[in-house]
Design a protein with these regions (language model features):
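Conserved class I S-adenosyl-L-methionine
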Residues: 1-50, 64-68, 88, 108-113, 159-201
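A short glycine-rich, Lys/Arg-flanked "PGG" loop and its adjoining helix->strand segment in the class I
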Residues: 142-154
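A short SAM/SAH-binding and catalytic strip from SAM-dependent methyltransferases
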Residues: 127-141
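Short alpha-helix
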Residues: 221-236
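A short acidic, Gly/Pro-enriched loop at the edge of an enzyme's catalytic core
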Residues: 115-129
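C-terminal helical/coil "lid" or tail adjacent to the Rossmann-like core of SAM-dependent
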Residues: 20, 241-303
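Class I SAM-dependent methyltransferase SAM/SAH-binding core
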Residues: 56-58, 62-117
């Protein structure tokens, strides 16, 4: 069944905004590294967007990237926020639903996959699709890209970025998101073995490490090389320009705010409490992640050529 513009109905949340989405939003909405990242994306798409065109923010999350687009772009455009998380999109709705040019669309679950963009908003509906900090989380990338291609008008553009893509010529000391997550996880496990404040978690730790592998990879999937993304674009019918790389400094204090988001902690250290920790487990997990993060930051300051006493580089 095809969808026409006149049939498009904006999604509305059916529940209050979740604490998890608010916590994540607050951790990144004013973080300099996050905004600098978005600045690069907006600068790339700004010359391409004209009045009355439709821009899709794919993987819009809690609305931070959409806020940036609305604030930075002078063109009078229609903005569609699309995400597969009702919780995340609900936060974006809370912030941006008063904008007359903004609509919201939830990617519905279809058996083992989510609906494509074309299945959600229709074919040849979007002039431009932008995607911030999302593509590295998508398992079926080629199918997703094909859905984006089908949803775009002729001569439309698709622009995405991520801080978690592998590339061979990365400068020594430049990290990815995943590098810090793995290191914090490993340091925290060592602390369980050495710090008696957490000795109650030692007994089942080996079993929990094995049991929670899938949860860790669900929240923080293994990074894929840039060539994988370029091949997926080509196989999905896109022509692409050469990727652009930019180094960004992340302050330790800002990154700690990110690492303390409870929903993310369920992927950073799920061996303590899993997806549904008790209040005590949640508190202990947070304390462990704080301690492990501070040790990581100290190690980076002392050993990483792209870090100093305030920040590291991605």
């Amino acid at each position: 069944m095809s969808i026409t513009s006149s049939q498009l109905k904006s999604w509305h949340p059916d529940r209050p905004v979740s604490k998890g989405s608010t916590s994540y939003h607050n951790a990144v909405v004013n973080a300099p590294y996050y905004l600098e990242n978005l600045d690069v994306l907006v600068d790339l798409v700004k010359p391409k967007i004209r009045d009355n065109e439709t821009v899709v923010d794919f993987g819009a999350g809690t609305g931070v990237s959409a806020m940036h687009l609305l604030r930075k772009l002078k063109a009078k455009f229609n903005l569609y926020l699309v995400d597969n998380s009702a919780a995340w999109l609900g936060k974006a709705y809370e912030i941006l639903s008063n904008y007359s040019n903004v609509k919201f669309f939830l990617l519905e679950k279809k058996e083992e996959r989510y609906a494509t963009l074309a299945e959600t908003i229709g074919e040849k509906e979007a002039d431009h699709v932008v995607c911030a900090n999302t593509v590295h989380l998508i398992p079926e990338l080629e199918n997703t890209f094909k859905g984006i291609n089908s949803a775009m008008k002729q001569k439309g553009t698709f622009t995405f970025q991520s801080g978690n893509i592998l590339r061979q010529d990365r400068k020594k000391g430049v990290l990815m998101v995943d590098d810090t997550i793995i290191r914090v996880h490993d340091i925290a496990l060592d602390m369980i073995s050495s710090n008696d404040n957490f000795r109650k978690y030692r007994k089942d730790i080996d079993n929990n490490i094995e049991k929670e592998k899938e949860q860790r990879k669900f929240v923080f999937p293994d990074p894929r090389p840039v060539q994988f993304y370029l091949k997926s674009l080509k196989n999905s019918g896109f022509k692409y320009e050469n990727p652009i790389y930019k180094l960004i400094k992340i302050a330790y204090k800002d990154w700690l705010d990110f690492l303390r988001v409870k929903r993310l902690q369920a992927g950073i250290l799920p061996e303590i409490g899993g997806k549904e920790p008790s209040p005590e487990e949640e508190q202990d997990r947070d304390e462990l992640i704080i301690l492990a993060s501070n040790q990581l930051f100290n190690d980076l300051e002392m050993q990483n050529p792209m870090a100093d006493n305030k920040c590291f580089t991605v």
